[in-house]
Regions:
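Interdomain hinge/linker elements that couple catalytic modules in large macromolecular machines
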Residues: 1-182, 196, 202
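A cross-kingdom feature that marks ATP-driven nucleic-acid transaction machinery
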Residues: 107, 113-284
């Protein structure tokens, strides 16, 4: 009941905060881009042009690196929007290299992360405190460090299309794979808060598919009681939480809190899962 009253009283504030969050999602945080947005009275044309200049600089920087892995870096960089728009969102090495050797791409991911172009997210095959001990580097997600840049990168071949749909997305009149953008910006915010990114998938042999898919796992709790916290990211107001519920049953003794990050207001479910609006991710 307390949560219900809080939700009712803060509805106008939540609506305003979500609008500002969507602005940030589309514009990003690059100083020149933000300046263009403010100076042009919150129009998007020059915003997109500034972002494309930054993306061009990234590509030029890649062309200057050691040729031994320059092509690998480019192949990952160019396909980031495609990987993130897929269901699993992870990099599929076999689509880049028929030998399917993930280890051959380790320097590639390191360069992209070290250059602050991307944020890495590794699979944990047995999530517990000390996530790096169960890290599986054969499975990786590669997020853009700036979600505004990801939006423009996704429309590299159709810049005029991108310019025409900014306002439509901002006003919720058009949906362009918001799941990709939401998950990317949550990754961006978690990294900014100091978290190293991990995810978890469980493959069901009988069903021949994943039956648990957790977007992010972070370390949480105080110094005397450190545990893990699973996070599911939802870009729409209607969703299911089967994966998170199964994960909680499987690893309940290891879990501090479980979170759903969604477009709706703050609430706590009867099963203890904490649902937070996307703009509150920095609190985790």
């Amino acid at each position: 009941q307390t949560v219900s009253r809080a939700d009712h009283g803060t509805k106008p504030l939540h609506k305003k905060a979500m609008f500002l969050f969507k602005q940030y999602l589309l514009v990003g945080g690059m100083p020149k881009v933000v300046s263009a947005y403010i100076e042009d009275n919150k129009q998007f044309e020059n915003v997109d042009e500034e972002k494309r200049e930054i993306l061009k600089t990234y590509r030029n920087d890649i062309m200057k690196i050691d040729q031994n892995y320059q092509s690998k870096v480019l192949s990952i960089y160019d396909r980031i929007p495609g990987f993130l728009s897929s269901h699993e969102k992870r990099v599929k090495i076999n689509s880049l290299d028929t030998t399917n050797r993930a280890i051959a791409y380790e320097e590639t991911f390191f360069w992209l992360a070290d250059s602050m172009i991307c944020n890495e997210c590794f699979s944990s095959n047995d999530p517990n405190v000390g996530l790096s001990l169960t890290e599986d580097r054969t499975y990786i997600k590669c997020y853009m460090s700036d979600t505004g840049l990801l939006f423009s990168h996704a429309f590299d071949e159709y810049p005029e299309v991108a310019k025409s749909i900014y306002s439509s997305i901002l006003q919720d009149k058009l949906s362009v794979n918001k799941g990709m953008l939401y998950e990317n910006i949550i990754a961006q915010m978690l990294v900014a808060s100091g978290h190293k990114l991990y995810f978890y998938n469980h493959y069901n042999e009988d069903k021949h598919r994943n039956d648990i898919e957790i977007d992010f796992i972070i370390i949480s709790g105080d110094k005397t009681n450190v545990k893990i916290s699973p996070i599911e990211v939802k870009s729409s107001k209607k969703y299911t939480t089967t994966s998170l519920e199964k994960f909680n049953l499987t690893f309940k003794k290891r879990i501090s809190n479980s979170y759903i990050i969604h477009p709706k207001n703050l609430s706590i479910r009867d099963d203890g899962i904490i649902c937070i609006p996307a703009y509150m991710t920095f609190c985790l």
